[in-house]
UniProtKB/Swiss-Prot annotation:
Induction: Up-regulated by Golgi stress-inducing agents such nigericin, trichostatin, tetoposide, campothecin and brefeldin A. Up-regulated by IL1B/interleukin-1 beta and TNFA/TNF-alpha. The keyword Zinc applies. Belongs to the TRIM/RBCC family. Zn(2+) binds at C227, H230, C249, H255. It catalyses: S-ubiquitinyl-[E2 ubiquitin-conjugating enzyme]-L-cysteine + [acceptor protein]-L-lysine = [E2 ubiquitin-conjugating enzyme]-L-cysteine + N(6)-ubiquitinyl-[acceptor protein]-L-lysine. E3 ubiquitin-protein ligase. Positively regulates the NF-kappa-B signaling pathway. (Microbial infection) Exhibits antiviral activity against Japanese encephalitis virus (JEV). Ubiquitinates the viral non-structural protein 2 (NS2A) and targets it for proteasome-mediated degradation. This is E3 ubiquitin-protein ligase TRIM52. Autoubiquitinated. Polyubiquitinated. Undergoes extremely rapid proteolytic degradation by the proteasome. The lineage of its organism: Eukaryota, Metazoa, Chordata, Craniata, Vertebrata.
């Protein structure tokens, strides 16, 4: 006699509607999301917080890697600029260190004659150029260096200080903007944290709980071939975690980078291996039996 499927009673159907698809228990402070499905406030909040934390950690890791690369390049340029300025400064100091402090333009009274300041600087610049030609004239062109007055070095150093010594530092990453949340039941995406309290459902759950303390999960029960978390058919097999998963699990962070196979292929391969192992065992037993009979004869 062929069996027939039993239909749940109206009370069982009512109980099933009062069960959260995430925790598989009666709703606690139920809220409705944009697609119309209901969940416990604590369940959906915890799910969102976990995803937000993972997203933020990934963005911070990417930002730190970019900052490390930029810092290495900036430090190379900074170090080169410092060495160039120090080298030129030392060359300038050695070039003009032979000038005595007594070589000042003083008047007959022994007091500095400030009227001759312009003449003093012009003549000193000419002497510096002559000294530079004297010291560097005999060098090969590829060994020559530029020698500048101290004032020019300091002026150029101040202009490039902000650009080279203090490279642009990007501000820390801002908090991630609201992303997309996929409903565990219908997988429809919508803006996160867009839910509203469902007071009518909360009152109904309270009445049902008094009548039936233990919830009836019906099709939401973790029967064989159904995902306990997403209530989807287990159609895939994760080769890394060695477990059957649903299509929603496949898109989650825990399995997104893993290699998966259709569950049917894995089951078929397993059955073939099991059958082959069984046949090999039977053949070995038969061979041992034949050898035993031949030995006894």
């Amino acid at each position: 006699m062929a069996g027939y499927a039993t239909t749940p009673s109206p009370m069982q159907t009512l109980q099933e509607e009062a069960v959260c698809a995430i925790c598989l228990d009666y709703f606690k402070d139920p809220v409705s999301i944009s697609c119309g499905h209901n969940f416990c406030r604590g369940c959906v909040t915890q799910l969102w917080s976990k995803e937000d934390e993972e997203d933020q950690n990934e963005e911070e890791d990417e930002w730190e890697e970019e900052e490390d690369e930029e810092a290495v390049g900036a430090m190379d340029g900074w170090d080169g600029s410092i060495r160039e300025v120090l080298y030129r400064g030392n060359a300038d100091e050695e070039l003009f260190q032979d000038q005595d402090d007594d070589e000042l333009w003083l008047g007959d009274s022994g007091i500095t004659n400030w009227d001759n300041v312009d003449y003093m600087w012009d003549e000193e610049e000419e002497e510096e150029e002559e000294d530079q030609d004297y010291y560097l004239g005999g060098l090969r062109p590829d060994l020559r260096i530029d020698v500048y007055r101290e004032e020019e070095i300091l002026e150029a150093y101040d202009e490039d200080e902000d650009e080279e010594l203090y490279p642009d530092i990007h501000p820390p990453p801002s908090l991630p903007l609201p992303g997309q949340f996929t409903c565990p039941q219908c997988r429809k995406s919508f803006t996160r944290r867009s839910f509203r309290p469902n007071l009518q459902l909360a009152n109904m759950v309270q009445i049902i709980r008094q009548m039936c303390p233990t919830p009836y999960r019906g099709n939401r029960s973790n029967d064989q071939g159904m995902c306990f978390k997403h209530q989807e058919a287990l159609k895939l097999f994760c080769e890394v975690d060695k477990e059957a998963i649903c299509v929603v699990c496949r898109e989650s962070r825990s399995h997104k980078q893993h290699s998966v196979l259709p569950l049917e292929e894995v089951v078929q391969e397993y059955q073939e291996i099991k059958l082959e192992t069984t046949l090999v065992g039977i053949l070995q037993i038969e061979q041992e039996s034949i050898h035993s009979k031949a030995y006894n004869q």
